[in-house]
Amino acid sequence: DCAADRSGAVAAVGKYIYEHYRTHRLVAGNDSRLAAMPWRDAGVLPRFGALEPGEPVALSYARLAIAETGVVVTFTGRANPAANNLLSENHIVLVDGADLVPDMEAGWACINALIAEEGRPRGINMIAGPSSTADIEGKLVQGAHGPRQWHVIPCRWFFGGDSIE
């Protein structure tokens, strides 16, 4: 999925969670960008806060993404509880096109600039895919230490509304 605007992002999230979980419910952090999304347009029912046991889908907003490695970077704290990144069965991440950087060096420069501007976050997560391990008898196991599935939705717009095209 690639969304052209906020409505497209909401539609992509709604379609994905319904196809995989037959639900319109998810948990989203207290990020103001997520709160401003037109969730009702797609019938999505977000609960804002930290993931609780039994809730399979969490939604986050990436601070940036690194093209070279496919990594998304999230800062943890009140706006993005660590549990949402690490404990859900399925983690969905929205990434603004304006927040895409070419490589790790540019990623670290951006992280340092964000920290200088906003202060140090509780934690920094660099996520490159769903959790997996092959430690047990050499057999690949998904979801061993985190989400079994990971879905990134790039958005071709700045949150402020200006298109990057």
Language model region names:
Residues 1-165:
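The feature marks the mature, well-folded catalytic cores of soluble enzymes
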